[in-house]
Regions:
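Domain-level signature for soluble enzymes in the chorismate/prephenate branch of the shikimate pathway
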Residues: 1-144
């Protein structure tokens, strides 16, 4: 098991009343009525974000295109929330953001396919052994 990465919706830690997408929908309407603007969502993945939010009934938002360091957008006032790729959640936490309970847009992981012919090749087999050993050690380090 390696290469796990998820596209998630993250909100500021201090949004204590926002735990789910339904809560986010309420906030989006509040922002629309009180500020006469839409909830700003910073992302590098506008199509996936739009499809997900619309499928969940969230309509009062606008996409802010991110060119990088998306997790900083709420802090600098460029957006209220973000969607971004995360593996461990550490960068989100470091920026006082957290993933909504049902805020997983896309879950992914890497997969390795190896042919029997490749396994019979000593050089390729040795490379595979080194790769798998490295991944095993990395996973053990991440667990500790």
């Amino acid at each position: 098991d390696f290469g796990n990465a998820n596209l998630v919706i993250a909100v500021p830690d201090d949004w204590i009343d926002v735990q789910t997408i339904a809560d986010l929908e309420e906030v989006s309407f509040d922002i629309r009525s009180k500020r006469n603007t839409r909830l700003r969502v910073a992302t590098k993945y506008p199509n996936l974000t739009n499809d997900f939010l619309i499928s969940k009934g969230v309509t009062q938002y606008k996409i802010i295109s991110s060119l990088g360091a998306t997790e900083t957008y709420p802090f600098i006032g460029s957006s209220e929330i973000i969607t971004d790729i995360t593996s461990t959640g550490k960068t989100l936490a470091d920026n006082n953001l957290r993933v909504l309970k049902d805020g997983f847009i896309l879950k992914s992981s890497a997969c390795m396919l190896v042919s029997k012919k490749s396994l019979r090749n000593k050089r390729k087999s040795k490379m595979l052994s080194f790769f798998l050993k490295d991944k095993k050690e990395t996973n053990l380090e991440n667990e500790n």
